[in-house]
Structures are given as C-alpha cells and as structure tokens.
C-alpha cells in the first residue's frame, strides 16, 4: 500500500519542543515509521527541512517556510503547498492520503 502523510505546518522529523514540534509530530513520525515496515510511506511538509529516504519511508520538504514562523502565519502558504504538492507527486499513486 502507498500512503501519503501530510504534515503541512511542521516537520515531524525536526526536534521535538522546537517551535510547533510536539505531540502531533511525534505521532506522525512514529506511525509513519511503523507503517513503513510493511508499506511505502511518504511524509510531506511545507516547513524547510532536509528531505530523506530510508527504505520504505520517504520524507519530502517542499521548503516553503522557515521553521520559526508562527503556526498562525503559515496559513497564507496553503495554496503554495497544494500547488507544489501536485507538481511534485502523482497523488493518484497513493492508496491513502492522511492529513492532520
């Protein structure tokens, strides 16, 4: 199964407790890692971060905004996130798309 996790406002692989990184980031990171044991998982964020691929887990940063930006100020980037997401990935190739 191909699974897409959308983590628009913060990278779930950044340091916990930094800016918006907290419980939801831990949840997305852990569930993505566990799901990748048996499935292909792609996690995408708008926050600037380093992208990586580790076996069945791929993390993609669309590098739209800095991590120190307040969550309320990130809303203006939603359309750009959507556009870059559609340009970067074939969304029809995913069986499940989950956004938190």
Model-flagged regions — what are they?
Residues 19, 23, 72-80, 96:
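Short, surface-exposed alpha-helical recognition segments that flank or form part
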Residues 38-40, 56, 93:
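A generic structural signal for alpha->beta connector loops
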Residues 9-12, 65-66, 87-90:
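A short alpha-helix capping/helix-coil boundary motif
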Residues 33, 83-90:
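Surface-exposed alpha-helical segments enriched in charged/polar residues
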Residues 57-86:
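A short, charged, and often flexible helix/loop element on the N-terminal side
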Residues 89-100:
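Short N-terminal targeting/anchoring amphipathic segment
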Residues 1-51:
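N-terminal subdomain of nucleotide-sugar transferases
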